[in-house]
Amino acid sequence: MSKTFPTVGIIADGLMAGMFISPGKSLGIELLCFDSKDAGHSDIQKCEVVTIAAQSNSLIIAKKLEAAGVTVRPTFSAMSAASEAINSAVDKATQICVMVARSPHGQATTWAPTQVISSNKKWTMSISPAPQLTSALQEKAQKLAMDFSAQIGAVGVIAVEMSVKEEDVSVVNVHIHPHDSGNWTIDGSVTNQYEQHLRAILDLPLGDPSMTATYVVTGNFHCGDKPNMYRPYLHLMARTPALKFHQYKNSGAPGELMGHITLAGNDLPKVIEEIEHALQYLQGEIDE
């Protein structure tokens, strides 16, 4: 790899690619972003390393790039192994996600396990650390995720989804790239998942994954009845000054994902209450 600042190729859908821009600039890294449809673009050959965070055709893309001599992280082999870990037979149990970062030389870190809450088959809220887990279960889940990432030879950030029932923890799905479940790290961790992913694929020392508060709650908001998605800022910013907004788009179809909000604090019931209020207000379910 060149001793000058490297060029990194990001193959991802628009929203995901945009998440890498700020940490990339902070590290002085040149990013070239490509849609999954542009994976054959000649500029990819200019990149010292390419990472794939596309939701579709990622295995096909990785295989073609590696055959062309491009350094891809994570590799086709790791991505293929991760895809085999999916277990669709999940009973009613606590759903958590553990984010892991791993570099080529084997340094690995993990963030606090996150409880994932869904409604109508949509991911709506995450709570970190997962409040229903004992410290022993948290450590068990983190170790399971770390061991899995090493087993498949993952490089970069991966999201390991798990089912927890009593003392049993099992892997049910794996996303071998940064994931929505880790968006709480943008405002709630010393090093967020997107910066950590860049560090990992470039084989740089990994950052501190510690939380910045006792609890961090993140909520996804979808397009509702608000004709103006900007006006809710007036009420919500005045009510909860510590609330962090990440608006992906200004308009959309009903039910479409519009962005996420995050709040950190030490009083979990209060933090959840504020996030729930903000989600309802943003989605037009309440007016005050």
Task: Identify the function of each model-found stretch.
Residues T4, I29, H41, A200-E288:
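Peripheral (often C-terminal) accessory segments that flank ATP-dependent C-N-forming ligase machineries
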Residues D168-P178:
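A short beta-strand motif that forms the metal-chelation/ATP-contact edge
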Residues E84-V160, V164-E166:
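Internal nucleotide-binding/catalytic subdomain
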Residues T51-I52, N87, N220:
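Redox-cofactor binding/interface segments in oxidoreductases and associated redox assembly factors
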Residues K140-V160, I176-G224:
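Active-site "cap" helix and flanking loop/linker of ATP-utilizing ligase/carboxylase catalytic domains
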Residues M1-S80:
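ATP-binding N-terminal substructure of ATP-dependent carboxylate-amine bond-forming enzymes
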Residues L59, V70-T71, S103-G106, S118, ...:
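Generic secondary-structure signature for well-ordered alpha-helical cores
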